[in-house]
């Protein structure tokens, strides 16, 4: 269920401060964050945000199609290596 419209979008204040500082200075260095729950705002477009996936920081370049989505959607947390192959089928 989506967030109520009367509440508005959520963003962590520490991340918002870092984004505003990067936009103001024109800095293109990735912004490191653990805040996967924060919504992507229009002032983040063009920035690279390194989102933590539980093991490492995944660089996410923010484009205009991403506005309104959460940062965590673009940093996968699980690695799928496929199911084990059937050994009997391999012999044939």
From Swiss-Prot:
Entry keyword set: Ribonucleoprotein, Ribosomal protein, RNA-binding, rRNA-binding
Disulfide linkage: none
GO CC term, one of those recorded: small ribosomal subunit
One GO term (biological process): translation
Highest taxon of source: Bacteria
Coiled-coil region: none
A Pfam family annotated for this UniProt entry: Ribosomal_S19
InterPro entries associated with the record: Ribosomal_uS19 (IPR002222), Ribosomal_uS19_bac-type (IPR005732), Ribosomal_uS19_CS (IPR020934), Ribosomal_uS19_SF (IPR023575)
Record-level Gene Ontology MF annotations: rRNA binding; structural constituent of ribosome
Family: Belongs to the universal ribosomal protein uS19 family.
HAMAP family to which the protein is assigned, alphabetical: Ribosomal_uS19
Function: Protein S19 forms a complex with S13 that binds strongly to the 16S ribosomal RNA.
PANTHER family in the record: RIBOSOMAL PROTEIN S19P FAMILY MEMBER, SMALL RIBOSOMAL SUBUNIT PROTEIN US19M
Name of the protein this chain belongs to: Small ribosomal subunit protein uS19
């Amino acid at each position: 269920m989506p967030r109520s419209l009367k509440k508005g979008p959520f963003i962590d204040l520490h991340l918002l401060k870092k984004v505003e500082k990067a936009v103001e200075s024109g800095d293109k260095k990735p912004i490191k964050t653990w805040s996967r729950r924060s919504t992507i705002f229009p002032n983040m477009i063009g920035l690279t945000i390194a989102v933590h996936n539980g093991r490492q920081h995944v660089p996410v370049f923010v484009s205009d199609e991403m506005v309104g989505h959460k940062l965590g959607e673009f940093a996968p947390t699980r690695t799928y290596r496929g199911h084990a192959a059937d050994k009997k089928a391999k012999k044939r």
